[in-house]
Amino acid sequence: KVMQDFIHQHNISSILALGFFHGVSTCYMAAALEEVGGGSIVSIDLESAQKRQPNIEELLEKCGYLNTVEFYYEPVSYNWRMMKLIEEQEKTFDLCYVDGGHDWYNTGLAFFLVDKLLQPGGWMIFDDLDWTMEHLDAKWALRKPEEERITPQVRKVWELLVKPHPHYSNFYEQDGWGYAQKIDI
């Protein structure tokens, strides 16, 4: 409901979604775009998301949005796909929803890449500002130094990169999400 209200309130028509897990958020965003007269979504996650049950393709088909969303499965990071979008110079977005990576490396670079794809006046929303990998028992997480496992890395990106950036303003936080608007320069 929060995302749908935001899309309506800000007249969003083109969305870049970084991280989709099963694709539930993407379906909600597609429904909200349909309610405001249509739009487009590019949604990117890791190849491992393809194996989830249900996966984004199945959910989009069930909801009737399979032909309205471009989705990509990447082997390492959504950042590689964004590099391609920047190279192609065919798409810009008025909203980027960041709900993947959740670490300094992916989310930090993603901020600067999204900046190249985000229209002036567009918004970035960072989900899970205070999430940590502290309680994960996955091998990849356990290989990280303790400091990285206990640090809310999306929060670090928000505080150290996004908020001080001269091209962003209208910052606010709500329910673990950080909102920032790209100013018209």
Sequence positions of predicted segments:
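S-adenosylmethionine/decaboxylated-SAM
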Residues: 1-185
